[in-house]
């Protein structure tokens, strides 16, 4: 199945389900580390909402692309804690919190809600009662009524595309990104242009939908994978996909995967630069940028000395968020071989040190009027 349409991507884009060794629930420590870097931004966003004359009785918040790991629980806890702090300061008596957890229909909502505990949401007798609902669907379209949201949070989700970029075959139907699954140094310029164009289209749709749902002066805190370089083929931004493509190509050479399946597969994901994100937000015109920054984190658990353990841990993280979409293209039966090959490639690259991962924090306010 080629990922050429939004419907097909929506069917296979989700994190590994359950709570097993390869599940996202057990391998989300890196995204948890990323999200923790944005905790202050989220706290400030809640503080800002209370400084505006909303006359709040209930704060409506959503976590878009919440997946099924513990990270979304930390988001709920942070919002609730800040609301309780403001309630004590302002002597509020009736404030409530409504949180909507959103992801695509294939998301493991069962594991997600099984993990919700009284420690996360508290009880209804507390000073800020918390109510949680699931909202399945694509955040590239409308999910909520007009002017219904005060706060939008999303971590490591907005960089996923609605489909593989259009125009990656020539007039004869031959692949233009042969042997690769993302932008690389050998990709022709049209591949880079197609990826940026698709991200521009999708992020604009995201902003347009939120502009209708978020109340005037409401806030959005977005964390997405990005890059520091202006070059989208820079190894810092594409090394995961580059190493996966090498692993897939080795299985092609062994006759375990058809070469055509590799040549026709392009991952529906784009890691933008800060300048590209800023340009799209300003062109859309619905939100002002209150804060934007990029930061780097080690891609591996550097405290682990054994390079094989580090390589295996990195593979588990990558497998947790790539296996559903990769197995859809290449087959479930070769996944163990593929990720074992990936581990060997990662370990061999450790000698040259894998690049750090760049993330972007973006805080937006809905323009009033």
Curated annotation (Swiss-Prot):
<feature type="binding site">
    <location>
        <position position="265"/>
    </location>
    <ligand>
        <name>Mg(2+)</name>
    </ligand>
</feature>
<dbReference type="InterPro" id="IPR029063">
    <property type="entry name" value="SAM-dependent_MTases_sf"/>
</dbReference>
<feature type="binding site">
    <location>
        <position position="24"/>
    </location>
    <ligand>
        <name>S-adenosyl-L-homocysteine</name>
    </ligand>
</feature>
<dbReference type="Pfam" id="PF03492">
    <property type="entry name" value="Methyltransf_7"/>
</dbReference>
<feature type="binding site">
    <location>
        <position position="138"/>
    </location>
    <ligand>
        <name>S-adenosyl-L-homocysteine</name>
    </ligand>
</feature>
<feature type="binding site">
    <location>
        <position position="225"/>
    </location>
    <ligand>
        <name>caffeine</name>
    </ligand>
</feature>
<keyword id="KW-0479">Metal-binding</keyword>
<feature type="site" description="Involved in substrate discrimination">
    <location>
        <position position="153"/>
    </location>
</feature>
<comment type="similarity">
    <text>Belongs to the methyltransferase superfamily. Type-7 methyltransferase family.</text>
</comment>
<feature type="binding site">
    <location>
        <position position="71"/>
    </location>
    <ligand>
        <name>S-adenosyl-L-homocysteine</name>
    </ligand>
</feature>
<dbReference type="GO" id="GO:0102741">
    <property type="term" value="F:caffeine synthase activity"/>
</dbReference>
<feature type="binding site">
    <location>
        <position position="321"/>
    </location>
    <ligand>
        <name>caffeine</name>
    </ligand>
</feature>
<feature type="site" description="Involved in substrate discrimination">
    <location>
        <position position="332"/>
    </location>
</feature>
<feature type="binding site">
    <location>
        <position position="177"/>
    </location>
    <ligand>
        <name>Mg(2+)</name>
    </ligand>
</feature>
<comment type="pathway">
    <text>Alkaloid biosynthesis.</text>
</comment>
<feature type="binding site">
    <location>
        <position position="159"/>
    </location>
    <ligand>
        <name>caffeine</name>
    </ligand>
</feature>
<feature type="binding site">
    <location>
        <position position="160"/>
    </location>
    <ligand>
        <name>caffeine</name>
    </ligand>
</feature>
<feature type="binding site">
    <location>
        <position position="103"/>
    </location>
    <ligand>
        <name>S-adenosyl-L-homocysteine</name>
    </ligand>
</feature>
<dbReference type="GO" id="GO:0046872">
    <property type="term" value="F:metal ion binding"/>
</dbReference>
<dbReference type="GO" id="GO:0032259">
    <property type="term" value="P:methylation"/>
</dbReference>
<feature type="site" description="Involved in substrate discrimination">
    <location>
        <position position="269"/>
    </location>
</feature>
<feature type="binding site">
    <location>
        <position position="66"/>
    </location>
    <ligand>
        <name>S-adenosyl-L-homocysteine</name>
    </ligand>
</feature>
<feature type="site" description="Involved in substrate discrimination">
    <location>
        <position position="225"/>
    </location>
</feature>
<protein>
    <recommendedName>
        <fullName>Caffeine synthase 1</fullName>
        <ecNumber>2.1.1.160</ecNumber>
    </recommendedName>
</protein>
<comment type="function">
    <text>Involved in the biosynthesis of caffeine. Catalyzes the conversion of 7-methylxanthine (7mX) to theobromine and of theobromine to caffeine.</text>
</comment>
<feature type="binding site">
    <location>
        <position position="139"/>
    </location>
    <ligand>
        <name>S-adenosyl-L-homocysteine</name>
    </ligand>
</feature>
<dbReference type="InterPro" id="IPR042086">
    <property type="entry name" value="MeTrfase_capping"/>
</dbReference>
<dbReference type="InterPro" id="IPR005299">
    <property type="entry name" value="MeTrfase_7"/>
</dbReference>
<feature type="site" description="Involved in substrate discrimination">
    <location>
        <position position="317"/>
    </location>
</feature>
<feature type="binding site">
    <location>
        <position position="156"/>
    </location>
    <ligand>
        <name>caffeine</name>
    </ligand>
</feature>
<keyword id="KW-0808">Transferase</keyword>
<feature type="binding site">
    <location>
        <position position="31"/>
    </location>
    <ligand>
        <name>caffeine</name>
    </ligand>
</feature>
<feature type="binding site">
    <location>
        <position position="104"/>
    </location>
    <ligand>
        <name>S-adenosyl-L-homocysteine</name>
    </ligand>
</feature>
<feature type="binding site">
    <location>
        <position position="266"/>
    </location>
    <ligand>
        <name>Mg(2+)</name>
    </ligand>
</feature>
<keyword id="KW-0489">Methyltransferase</keyword>
<feature type="binding site">
    <location>
        <position position="263"/>
    </location>
    <ligand>
        <name>Mg(2+)</name>
    </ligand>
</feature>
<keyword id="KW-0460">Magnesium</keyword>
């Amino acid at each position: 199945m080629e990922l050429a349409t939004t419907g097909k991507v929506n069917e296979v884009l989700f994190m590994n389900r359950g709570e097993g060794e390869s599940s996202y629930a057990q391998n989300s420590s890196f995204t948890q580390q990323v999200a923790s870097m944005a905790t202050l931004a989220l706290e400030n966003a809640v503080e800002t909402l209370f400084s505006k004359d909303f006359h709040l009785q209930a704060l409506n918040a959503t976590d878009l692309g919440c997946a099924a790991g513990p990270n979304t629980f930390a988001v709920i806890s942070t919002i609730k804690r800040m609301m309780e702090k403001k309630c004590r300061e302002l002597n509020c008596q009736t404030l409530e919190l409504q949180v909507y957890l959103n992801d695509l229909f294939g998301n493991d909502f069962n594991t997600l809600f099984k993990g919700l505990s009284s420690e996360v949401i508290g009880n209804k007798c507390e000073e800020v009662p918390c109510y949680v609902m699931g909202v399945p669907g694509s955040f590239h379209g409308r999910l909520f009524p007009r002017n219904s949201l005060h706060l939008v949070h999303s971590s490591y989700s907005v960089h996923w595309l609605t489909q593989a970029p259009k125009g990656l075959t020539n007039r004869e139907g031959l692949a233009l990104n042969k042997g690769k699954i993302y932008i690389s140094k050998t990709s022709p310029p049209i591949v880079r242009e197609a990826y940026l164009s698709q991200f521009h289209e999708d992020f604009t749709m995201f902003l347009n939908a939120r502009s209708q749902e978020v109340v005037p002066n409401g806030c959005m805190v977005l964390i997405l994978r990005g890059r520091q370089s202006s070059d989208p083929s820079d190894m810092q931004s594409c090394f995961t996909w580059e190493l996966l493509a090498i692993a897939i190509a080795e299985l092609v050479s062994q006759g375990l995967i058809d070469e055509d399946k590799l040549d026709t597969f392009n991952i529906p994901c784009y890691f933008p630069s800060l300048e590209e994100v800023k340009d799209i937000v300003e062109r859309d015109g619905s939100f002002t940028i209150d804060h934007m920054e990029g930061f780097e984190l080690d891609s591996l658990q550097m405290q682990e000395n054994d390079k094989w353990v580090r390589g295996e841990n990195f593979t588990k993280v990558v497998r947790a968020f790539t296996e559903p979409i990769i197995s859809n293209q290449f087959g479930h039966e070769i996944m163990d071989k593929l990720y074992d090959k990936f581990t060997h490639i990662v370990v061999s690259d450790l000698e040259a040190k894998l690049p750090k991962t760049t993330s972007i924090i973006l805080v937006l306010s809905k323009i009033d009027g």
